[in-house]
């Protein structure tokens, strides 16, 4: 594994030279940390060179944001990372905010993208998503970082999985609090997501897209993924029956298989 920081973006490269294998770039959700993808690494590394990174303002990356900070800027950061690594093209797998960044990349830099996987993403503001983000912001603003972090599993995971894995979640909570971005960074990232709207441009995105969603996601309605799949010209919709917003964590085996099949050209 090689790691480094370019233009403020911490990243890791897992696998051999780009000449030996195709490269997959993993882009996390609102939290921004590349460690989110731990349940996917072994499966993806069996066939691909894997690059993960921490979003700007989060994790081990620079804690300052671009101004203005938009989802398009998040997509531009992927291009900056590719440029630094000498990658002309790559596959991108993105969860929620990271999936939206992938859509922005596909729209603004189509020549840099091979295939895109959008996990629990959306193309326009949604009332349910806004209500969830408003609630998270109220927790952050009114009660602080610890309360915000403590509440996150309620948005991410099914209730039965949360109950069964509570000890694990409590152990992770201290780490998440210690590594939390500044409240201003989190507010700005949420605002960028609430303003993201490329709905009228979806038909211009021509690359193959796997739209991956969980039927019981309580943060992003399934209708958002259905809309993406209906309006993107070259999209495939894959719906997990269970797993919540973070089904990449709660049900990784089926997700990993679907992504590998899609990226390898084996999807039906």
From Swiss-Prot:
Keyword check for Secreted: no
Methyltransferase keyword on record: no
Listed SUPFAM superfamilies: alpha/beta-Hydrolases
Keywords linked to the UniProt accession: Hydrolase
UniProt enzyme class: hydrolase
GO cellular component, one term: membrane
GO molecular function: hydrolase activity, acting on carbon-nitrogen (but not peptide) bonds, in linear amides; monoacylglycerol lipase activity
Role, per record: Involved in pyrimidine catabolism. May facilitate the hydrolysis of carbamate, a reaction that can also occur spontaneously.
GO process annotations (BP): acylglycerol catabolic process; nitrogen utilization; uracil catabolic process
Gene: rutD
Enzyme Commission number(s) of this protein: 3.5.1.-
Residue span, AB hydrolase-1 domain: 24-243
Catalytic activity: carbamate + 2 H(+) = NH4(+) + CO2
Protein name, as recorded: Putative carbamate hydrolase RutD
Family: Belongs to the AB hydrolase superfamily. Hydrolase RutD family.
Pfam families noted in UniProt: Abhydrolase_1
């Amino acid at each position: 594994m090689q790691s480094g920081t370019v233009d403020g973006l911490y990243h890791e490269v897992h696998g051999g030279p780009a000449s030996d294998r195709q490269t997959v770039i993993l882009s996390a959700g609102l939290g921004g940390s590349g460690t989110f993808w731990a349940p996917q690494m072994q499966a993806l590394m069996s066939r691909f060179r894997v690059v993960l990174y921490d979003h700007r303002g989060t994790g081990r990356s620079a804690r300052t944001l671009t101004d203005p900070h938009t989802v398009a800027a998040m997509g531009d950061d992927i291009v900056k990372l590719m440029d630094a690594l000498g990658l002309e093209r790559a596959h991108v797998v993105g969860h929620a905010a990271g999936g939206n960044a992938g859509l922005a990349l596909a729209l603004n830099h189509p020549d840099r993208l091979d295939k895109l996987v959008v996990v629990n993403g959306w193309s326009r503001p949604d009332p349910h998503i806004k209500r969830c983000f408003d609630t998270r912001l109220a927790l952050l603003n009114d009660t602080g970082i610890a309360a915000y972090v403590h509440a996150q599993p309620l948005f991410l995971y099914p209730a039965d999985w949360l109950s069964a894995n509570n000890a694990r979640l409590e152990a992770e909570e201290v780490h998440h609090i210690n590594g939390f971005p500044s409240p201003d960074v989190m507010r700005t990232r949420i605002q960028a997501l609430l303003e993201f709207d490329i709905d009228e441009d979806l038909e211009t995105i021509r690359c193959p897209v796997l739209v991956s969603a969980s039927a019981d996601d309580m943060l992003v309605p399934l209708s958002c993924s259905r809309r993406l799949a209906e309006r993107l010209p070259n999209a495939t919709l894959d719906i997990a029956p269970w797993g919540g917003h973070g089904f990449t964590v709660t049900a990784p085996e089926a997700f990993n298989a679907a992504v590998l099949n899609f990226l390898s050209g084996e999807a039906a």
